[in-house]
């Protein structure tokens, strides 16, 4: 085992990376309220794992979507548990995100030189809410359908660009298969990719600048 480690150490300098991570200074004022961001990230990982598991059975079709969700809940081994964890962690992710934003704001973590960290965090908050909006409609039940119809209709109030934006979101004049396909694509590919890139950027800036000091 030692030879295997030495082989990787010689090429990747694993120990130097581990020492750099473990030796990072943590200010003494940091307390449990500074854990909200880490909890959001943990919830995101749970979402990815449980969401990926459900893609094996979910069908993004207006005809089969509800039946496939019902199948996951009633027939797939532990399917009810996986979907329930997905829902619970989604709620937890949003709640922890809100608390994290409040904590950063109240402790002045958005001030110079951390403005860009704050900006990426705000964009991540928008992405998180978008996860909820797109995922809410995927079962394509009555609640999901009308929620989708209302959400995609909101931009119509924006002058000039509003109506074309509605067409892009819905994939046509009315809510239907094209809308569900767009929401599914956004929920399972576009938003996770955007969140991963933004989180990496967010973490690298925190790593570079450190945790803000006490007020």
UniProtKB/Swiss-Prot annotation:
Database matches in InterPro entries: Cyt_b/b6_N, Cyt_B6_PetB, Cytb/b6-like_sf, Cytochrome_b_N_euk/bac, Di-haem_cyt_TM
Residues engaged in binding heme b 2: 86, 187
GO cellular component, one term: chloroplast thylakoid membrane
Main location: plastid
Binding site for heme c: 35
Residues that coordinate or bind heme b 1: 100, 202
GO MF term (any one): metal ion binding
Annotated membrane topology: Multi-pass membrane protein
GO biological process: photosynthesis; respiratory electron transport chain
Keywords: Chloroplast, Electron transport, Heme, Iron, Membrane, Metal-binding, Photosynthesis, Plastid, Thylakoid, Transmembrane, Transmembrane helix, Transport
Protein function: Component of the cytochrome b6-f complex, which mediates electron transfer between photosystem II (PSII) and photosystem I (PSI), cyclic electron flow around PSI, and state transitions.
HAMAP family according to UniProt: Cytb6_f_cytb6
Oligomer and partners: The 4 large subunits of the cytochrome b6-f complex are cytochrome b6, subunit IV (17 kDa polypeptide, PetD), cytochrome f and the Rieske protein, while the 4 small subunits are PetG, PetL, PetM and PetN. The complex functions as a dimer.
Protein name as it appears in the record: Cytochrome b6
Organism, scientific name: Trieres chinensis (Marine centric diatom)
